[in-house]
UniProtKB/Swiss-Prot annotation:
One of the record's GO molecular function terms: manganese ion transmembrane transporter activity
Name used for this protein in its record: Putative manganese efflux pump MntP
Keywords: Cell membrane, Ion transport, Manganese, Membrane, Transmembrane, Transmembrane helix, Transport
Family: Belongs to the MntP (TC 9.B.29) family.
Species the sequence originates in: Clostridium novyi (strain NT)
Membrane topology classification: Multi-pass membrane protein
Taxon lineage: Bacteria, Bacillati, Bacillota, Clostridia, Eubacteriales
Amino acid sequence: MTVSIYSLFVIAVALALDAFGVSLSIGLSKNLRYKNKALFCISFGFFQFMLAYIGSYLGVLFNKYILVIPNIIGGIVIFVVGILMLKDGMKKDNKHMNIHKKMYFILGISVSIDAAIVGFTVLNSITSKLLLLESTIFIGIITSILCLIAFLISGYLKRINTISKYANYIGGVILMLFGLEMIFM
């Protein structure tokens, strides 16, 4: 079975919205370097691809056991990152957001857990390994592109003085709300 390019695009955009929101929030942080933005785009795209690919192989077997848990875990992680952004905003010398190498991995996985669910439920019907690889790579590329767009938008938003002054607070609150939405929806 195959998935139409239109359906795959809609799935890819829907999966990328978590990463888009997180990228937008992180992008509001003061003096975030281009290197950090690029690494987040790559991380989010890679984990969307990888978890969708792995999820398709695990398929129906784990679907009934893991369906609800990943959103809760991902939501908690994103909520905690929001709290950390608020904490960073309260520091007096807030010139740089503290980016740790672990953040690329942790956030990459937390925004991509839903890709594993899509793999379990939708992509596991694709029988060709090559087509499955192409489909999941497409999902990863769409995610990376949307994250890049989110970082570009956040760059324009930071130019507004009020947003720039309270960027960590705004980003932190957005992440916390987004995390709560993932947990309870």
